[in-house]
Amino acid sequence: RMPGVMRNGKKQFLVDTNIGKASWNEWYEWIEGINDDLPEPEGLGDVWDNLPDLSPCLIEGILRKGHKMLIAGPSKAGKSFLQIELCVAIAEGNKWLKWDCAQGKVLYVNLELDRASCLHRFKDVYTTMGIEQPQYLQNIDIWNLRGKSIPMDKLAPKLIRRAAKKDYVAIIIDPIYKVITGDENSADQMANFCNQFDKVCTELGCAVIYCHHHSKGSQGGKKSMDRASGSGVFARDPDALLDLIELETTEALLKQEENNATCQACKEYLDAHFNWQDDLTQDD
């Protein structure tokens, strides 16, 4: 407006001054506070007799769909193989480390291996698990990002956009040190980093599973949640935490495992060829 100037036969006036916000930043903070997308508080009494259903289990007794899980372990301990095995278990609806897995589609975000090595590992894991003729290969998608990784706060929106219509039940990110945003020893920066996993879980409704390495030095005197390298936020943030440690393979342990394998082989043979359970009594 131009005060004193005629417009369409009418004189323009300056109505008021010094109203509104003093700067763009001040106005932006004000409008963000009004237009936030946060949910409203709810009264416990309103839902007491009609509680929402718990999310179904993805890994029985360990992880629910829509939750987060951290796998921590020493460097070069086989964490990638373990996560590939988890991909296969979810895709095929099999057991993983003796835990039942719900069947569904899974996205494996490969940040460390070259494409050929990653694909060969998947086939090797299938073969080692005794699955010669996979039935649900279409349930596994692999996103190869070696050499193209970016910080998680920039990766999350791209990941959400690509996965929005895929109906994944789980997204596995291997490893997270490739996409860490900020200093891993800073609690506030790692809290912001872990918030990106929450964003993926919320937007896609799937579980997010990621692995991280142990800190340097001996881990024997530490609690499991203190072994992951960096800030303690890593251990406090996920809904489930699996920690991998290397056990000393003594002669007694090797003998025990050999006996267990022998007994299992004998049981499988008897189950396949005889009705031995009907012929034996409790005294036999």
Regions found by a protein language model. Give the residues of each.
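The Walker A/P-loop phosphate-binding site
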Residues: 37-127, 132-133, 142, 157, ...
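DNA replication initiation modules
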Residues: 1-37
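Generic preference for hydrophobic
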Residues: 2, 108, 142, 254-256
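Phosphate-binding/switch region of NTP-binding enzymes
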Residues: 70-71, 76, 80-81, 150, ...
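Conserved inter-motif catalytic segment of the P-loop NTP-binding fold
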Residues: 101-192, 199
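Short, surface-exposed amphipathic charged segments that create phosphate/polyanion-binding patches used
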Residues: 8, 13-19, 150-161, 254-260
